[in-house]
């Protein structure tokens, strides 16, 4: 039966998509209306069993939809229609005629919903979908209990709350009272229909605590024991309505002046905290920028003042790529306690590296050699619950964090990186600022002059050299074109996803590129008091990468500030080691130049 259901859902989805030109989300809305009509009919008059022609079937479908609008006015508006052609309606009802939804077991009903979710969200509208592995981890960390009130103020498909009910059901018998203790809130009517259908299919609930509303502008009568949420984030959906912003501390600057706009995830932090009972707990998925950006310190200070932070869990890069976004995110676990900042406490920092699926657009499950799902979030959960710490899962004092501008970046405190940096500082070391100067003066660009222009992509990360450039008039240069280069300058990328990795761009400027203009995505080091090869060698080490990782911030374009860069600790070697490094790099670069000239000669003249 499961295979038959899969085939029917797929055929219907493909038919509507091909014949109606609807997107996945619009197909979802049609599917839900049809499934509601069929379920409603089976529980009432069985009109569909009495149809004798396609015309009769079509008219019956219209009658059922009208009945639905009367029965569920909070779910269906008076203007709701199927919004597809008559023949498509007939096709869908015929495809579903071979099985009775109300006669299916709970598991099969749940499978129908999951199949719809997979087709409509995982394959199209991922912003409403949180990976099940992350949902499962969060629910186990929060540990919802029977009798507690829980909600998600931006519930999407309702995954968090359904998972919370499953968690409670693992040790208790689920009753109507348990379902009545959970609350769903979302702005989307279509998503509300999906949740209501799942509640009806799995729990027989016909009048759930399901509210179609914008949670940021709405008032709530209840306070909750736990809240689980992955609120919408990103600059594209910024809130600019002053009537909404005025309701939030985080909608204003420190002087109380309204921001012109604010991203929704920041407002949701405040909303969620306000909805918690004293002692209530919450888990919120947030972009890493909220944890680390210097300009976001007011957000973190607000959280510190209102809550006890229990844990910060760093999610892997690419966790949400299969679901529509590549933004790096972490999970914030809090307990509402405005007195928590008055005495120091420890905050757990954990890092999940594997979630059991591949981080690609067409994601697949990933397995270990023994056939088990390849994940390590269960291990992180165990370490948190049992206070087991290591280089990647550790605790930091709240006092240390508040003294660091409330920085909550996992990488800043990671024990593994700290050990590498400490190993440098236990020996002889300098700061980058002590051995060279930084070019800060921007070149005055003349619109008619021709320039060589160097971007990060013009660097060979394997050979640490500039391999190409663009030739552009001054008027054609982008606004980021900034610094004129001199021979033996060292340029190092301080922005982009590759910084702090083996693929970070760095190069020594050769005669060929003297006078070229480079992007401000580089820091330009000049007048080194030591051999540039010593610096170049250091920029290829794990010790350098660890310090960049500790200091970088930003989710869309990771960045390390120039101030943090020049403060990086640089090891000083003994004379013999320095001479060996300089000699080896000099030989390698000379051989590379000789090979380049020989190849150039061969290309120009050939061999007779």
Each PLM stretch: what is its role?
Residues 487-539:
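A short beta-sheet element
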Residues 383-444, 572-608:
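Non-catalytic DNA-recognition/assembly elements of restriction-modification systems
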Residues 31-119:
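Long recognition/docking surfaces used for binding and targeting
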Residues 196, 258-320, 325-334:
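Conserved Class I SAM-dependent methyltransferase catalytic core
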Residues 322-427:
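Flexible, glycine-/basic-rich loop-and-beta segments that form/coincide
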Residues 332, 411, 515-523, 552-577:
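A short glycine-rich beta-alpha junction/loop motif
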Residues 127-229, 234-238, 287-289, 298-300, ...:
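Conserved S-adenosyl-L-methionine
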Residues 433-443, 459-489:
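Sequence-specific dsDNA recognition surfaces
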């Amino acid at each position: 039966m499961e295979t038959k259901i899969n085939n029917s859902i797929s055929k219907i989805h493909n038919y509507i998509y091909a014949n109606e030109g609807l997107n996945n989300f619009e197909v979802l809305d049609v599917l839900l209306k049809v499934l509601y009509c069929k379920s409603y009919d089976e529980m009432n008059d069985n009109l569909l069993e009495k149809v004798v022609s396609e015309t009769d079937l079509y008219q019956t479908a219209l009658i059922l939809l009208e009945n639905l609008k009367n029965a569920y006015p909070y779910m269906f508006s008076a203007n709701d229609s199927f919004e597809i052609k008559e023949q498509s309606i007939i096709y869908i009802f015929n495809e579903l005629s071979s099985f009775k939804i109300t006669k299916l077991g709970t598991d099969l009903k749940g499978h129908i919903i999951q199949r719809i979710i997979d087709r409509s969200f995982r394959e199209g509208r991922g912003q409403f979908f949180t990976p099940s592995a992350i949902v499962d981890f969060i629910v186990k960390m929060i540990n919802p209990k029977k009798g507690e009130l829980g909600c998600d103020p931006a519930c999407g498909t309702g995954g968090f709350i359904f998972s919370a009910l499953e968690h409670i059901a693992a040790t208790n018998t689920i009753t109507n009272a348990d379902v009545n203790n959970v609350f769903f809130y979302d702005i989307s009517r279509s998503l509300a229909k999906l949740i209501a259908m799942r509640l009806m299919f799995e729990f027989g609930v016909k009048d759930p605590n399901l509210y179609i509303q914008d949670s940021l502008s709405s008032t709530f009568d209840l306070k909750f024991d736990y809240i689980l949420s992955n609120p919408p984030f990103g600059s594209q959906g910024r809130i600019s309505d002053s009537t909404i912003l005025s309701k939030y501390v985080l909608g204003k600057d420190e002087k109380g002046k309204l921001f012109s706009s604010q991203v929704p995830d920041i407002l949701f932090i405040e909303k969620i905290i306000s909805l918690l009972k004293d002692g209530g707990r919450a888990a919120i998925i947030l972009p890493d920028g909220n944890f680390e950006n210097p300009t976001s310190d007011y957000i973190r200070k607000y959280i510190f003042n209102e809550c006890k932070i229990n844990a910060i869990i760093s999610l892997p890069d690419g966790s949400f790529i299969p679901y529509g976004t590549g933004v790096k995110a972490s999970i914030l676990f809090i307990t509402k306690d405005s007195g928590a900042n008055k005495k120091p406490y420890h905050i757990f920092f954990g890092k999940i590296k594997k979630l059991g699926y591949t981080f690609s657009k067409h994601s697949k499950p990933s397995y270990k050699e023994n056939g088990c799902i390849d994940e390590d979030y269960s291990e992180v959960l165990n370490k948190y619950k049992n206070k087991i710490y290591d280089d990647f899962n550790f605790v930091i004092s709240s006092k240390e964090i508040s003294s660091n501008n409330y920085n909550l970046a996992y990488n800043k405190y990671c024990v593994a990186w700290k050990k590498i940096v400490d190993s440098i500082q236990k020996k002889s070391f300098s700061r980058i600022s002590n051995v060279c100067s930084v070019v800060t003066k921007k070149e005055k660009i003349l619109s008619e002059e021709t320039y060589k222009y160097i971007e990060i992509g013009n660097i060979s990360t394997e050979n640490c050299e500039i391999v190409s450039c663009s030739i552009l008039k001054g008027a054609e240069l982008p606004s980021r074109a900034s610094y004129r280069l001199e021979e033996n300058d060292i340029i190092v990328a301080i922005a982009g996803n590759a910084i702090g990795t083996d693929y970070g761009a760095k190069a020594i400027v050769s005669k060929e590129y003297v006078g070229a203009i480079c992007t401000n995505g580089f820091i330009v080091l000049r007048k080194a008091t030591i051999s540039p090869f010593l610096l170049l060698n250091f920029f290829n080490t794990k010790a350098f990468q660890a310090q960049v990782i500790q200091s970088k911030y930003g989710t869309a374009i990771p960045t390390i500030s120039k101030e943090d860069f020049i403060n990086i600790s640089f090891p000083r070697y003994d004379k013999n080691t320095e001479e060996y490094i300089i000699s080896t790099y000099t030989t390698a670069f000379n051989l590379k130049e000789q090979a380049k000239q020989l190849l150039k000669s061969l290309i120009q003249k050939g061999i007779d």
